[in-house]
Regions:
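Ser/Thr- (and often Asn-) enriched beta-sheet segments in non-cytosolic proteins
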Residues: 8, 14-16, 37, 46, ...
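C-terminal low-complexity, charged extensions that often adopt amphipathic alpha-helices
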Residues: 54-99
Length: 99
């Protein structure tokens, strides 16, 4: 779940982490309906939010401020890759994952 004062997003999440630290997050509402996808490594990210039409890709150092919370998820998952529950707050954004 993703929540701000004005937005709530609930869906099924698939998280992939590679041994080299590559991160992939896909949030969907059932088969074939992808709401959001994020691919990220140490230096680069690609973000597609189909539910808002927001898209961005490039070096992390050039990321728009509104993506900072999403781009912080990689580090959260890398700290405890086998965690069943993850709660992460970044500014006014709250992320909650339960696997």
């Amino acid at each position: 779940m993703y929540r701000t004062a004005k937005t709530t997003l609930i869906g099924e999440a698939i998280v992939r982490l590679s041994k080299s630290g590559d991160f992939e997050l896909t949030v969907s509402k059932g088969p074939g309906i992808t709401l959001l996808s994020l691919r990220q490594d140490v230096e680069f990210a690609e973000f597609n939010a189909n539910f808002t039409g927001q898209r961005w890709s490039g070096p992390l150092t050039e990321a728009p401020p509104q993506l900072r919370g999403w781009l912080g998820l990689r580090d959260q998952f890398l700290r405890a890759p086998n965690r069943k529950t993850l709660r992460y707050v970044s500014g006014s954004e709250m992320f909650f994952f339960h696997f």
